Amino acid sequence: MNKIANTEVEINIFNLLKKLWKKKFLITFVAIAFATAGLFYSLFIVTPQYTSSTRIYVINPNTPNNSITAQDLQAGSFLANDYKEIITSTDVLEKVISSEKLNYPSSQLLQKITVSILKDTRVISISVEDANPKMSQKLANSVREAAVSKIKAVTQVEDITTLEKGNLPKAPSSPNIKKNVLIGFIVGAGLSTIVLVIMGILDDRVNTEEDIEKVLGLTSLGIVSDLNKL
């Protein structure tokens, strides 16, 4: 009994795959349509964003004569996380808003800022994203200056070095056009395949001799050809 059931499942899956293969051009068309929609969205709907990055290096305040040991480096890495919180603090953000005369709240400015700590270092990278490349550079440098001032005030650290000033981005960092087109293609192909599979599963029409035998329990004696095709 189980063998018969397994055979039926295999036959159903095989028939389903045959139906999908017959619809391969439809699946491809839908996938290309979704990919085109992703391209259109990336080029004409979403606003391109530009990212400018600046980096600072912070010395551990407890390090005598600026001599660096492995223990100091580890301690500095932990302190870098504290500095990360200081950089994104409300005081720093409000200072940037005031100096740059921005007309949006600190919460919106915070969404533009990404602070990252390079692994096993005390190098902190500050990136700012904006629709205007010059503004992203200006904000990155402004955030760095305000953050350095705040870090010195809070931690009593005086030795903070600017490794890199904010760069002027030449090309947008987002949207990722290739990624959006690929996602659109995959989603289109996936959705069309799922719809066709569901339609195939729900299709209870009698199409083959095997379907007649299964539904009616009768043995087929022959096939009557379509006279219109003769």
UniProtKB/Swiss-Prot annotation:
A Pfam family recorded for this sequence: Wzz
Main location: membrane
Gene Ontology cellular-component annotations: plasma membrane
Known pathway: Capsule biogenesis; capsule polysaccharide biosynthesis
Protein's UniProt keywords contain Transmembrane: yes
Superkingdom assignment: Bacteria
Record keywords, A-Z: Capsule biogenesis/degradation, Cell membrane, Exopolysaccharide synthesis, Membrane, Transmembrane, Transmembrane helix
Gene Ontology terms, MF aspect: protein tyrosine kinase activity
Gene Ontology biological-process annotations: capsule polysaccharide biosynthetic process
Topology with respect to the bilayer: Multi-pass membrane protein
Keyword Protease part of the UniProt annotation: no
Membrane-spanning intervals of the chain: 25-45, 181-201
Subcellular location: Cell membrane
PANTHER family recorded: FERRIC ENTEROBACTIN TRANSPORT PROTEIN FEPE, TYROSINE-PROTEIN KINASE
UniProt function note: Required for CpsD phosphorylation. Involved in the regulation of capsular polysaccharide biosynthesis. May be part of a complex that directs the coordinated polymerization and export to the cell surface of the capsular polysaccharide.
Family: Belongs to the CpsC/CapA family.
Protein name: Capsular polysaccharide biosynthesis protein CpsC
Organism: Streptococcus agalactiae serotype III (strain NEM316)
Gene label: cpsC
